[in-house]
Amino acid sequence: MSDLLPLPPAAIRLPDLVRQHPPLVHCLTNQVVSQFTANVLLAAGAAPAMVIAREEAGDFARMASAVLVNVGTLTPVQADAMRVAVAAALEAGTPWTLDPVAVGALAFRTQFCRELLSQRPTAIRGNPAEILALAGEASRGRGVDSLDDSTVALAAARRLADATGAVVAVTGATDFITDGERVIALAGGHPLLQQVTGTGCSLSALVAAMTAMTDDPLSGAAVACALMKLAGERAADKAAGPGSFAVHLLDEIAALTPADLAQRWPA
């Protein structure tokens, strides 16, 4: 895979832009991770809003800087609110990110997420099994967990990006972020990231926040992945286990600088 690209220098500046000009991120996310997602966005300098009522979703999506759709605890009522928010985001030109949690494992959410693909998501962030399933390919998933390696899903991610116009981030031991042509690869992270509920979902929220700050969604999605990986590595050095890791992860997200990212992933 000689065509893999490093983290772009322009992307490294985006976390500082988020802190200087906090984007308002409208999160239609699942009830398990809502608080942690909000805290991750706050740590990164963004402004989270967890507006989920169908009656408010459209109005809020129009005023937001970015919209996140996460189907982790999807219900028919929530799906209706998501449809309204996505339609309003498209009308307003607001970037929106799809997190297809457990797609492929359950029929209702799989059908719903495939429906949303026609609404031109700016970015899609998922694990290998989710990306494979969303692309219509066989995957080995167990609920929200993936038994596939991210390398296996890269070709599917590229095809999904080509078909939808979205940037696709397939995350694992190595994260691959692609717009169908360009591919950025980021190795790293720490196993403790899989021991705390909500790290993947909050990463998708970071993708939404970062893509709101740039005309190049590939750079936005890539720096979000880099931020979570490096914060995870640093938090693990200080943590005694999953509980303290979650706290340190927030601290490290808040503390990371462009220089830290450039040192970890030199161009």
UniProtKB/Swiss-Prot annotation:
The pathway that the record names for this protein is: Cofactor biosynthesis; thiamine diphosphate biosynthesis; 4-methyl-5-(2-phosphoethyl)-thiazole from 5-(2-hydroxyethyl)-4-methylthiazole: step 1/1
Q: What is this enzyme's catalytic activity, as reactions? A: 5-(2-hydroxyethyl)-4-methylthiazole + ATP = 4-methyl-5-(2-phosphooxyethyl)-thiazole + ADP + H(+)
Which keywords appear in this protein's UniProt record, sorted alphabetically? ATP-binding, Kinase, Magnesium, Metal-binding, Nucleotide-binding, Thiamine biosynthesis, Transferase
Q: Which Pfam families match?
A: HK
The record ties this protein, via CDD domains, to: THZ_kinase
Q: Cofactor(s) for this protein?
A: Mg(2+)
Origin species, per record, is: Laribacter hongkongensis (strain HLHK9)
Biological processes per GO annotation: thiamine biosynthetic process; thiamine diphosphate biosynthetic process
Fetch the Gene3D superfamilies from UniProt. 3.40.1190.20
Q: Extract the HAMAP family matched here.
A: Thz_kinase (MF_00228)
* SUPFAM superfamilies to which the protein is assigned, alphabetical: Ribokinase-like (SSF53613)
Q: Which GO terms describe its molecular function?
A: ATP binding; hydroxyethylthiazole kinase activity; magnesium ion binding
Binding site residues for substrate: 50, 198
The entry's protein name is Hydroxyethylthiazole kinase
Q: What class of enzyme is it?
A: transferase
Tell me which residues bind ATP.
Answer: 125, 171
Outline what the protein does.
Answer: Catalyzes the phosphorylation of the hydroxyl group of 4-methyl-5-beta-hydroxyethylthiazole (THZ).
What EC number is given for this enzyme? 2.7.1.50
Q: Which family does it belong to?
A: Belongs to the Thz kinase family.
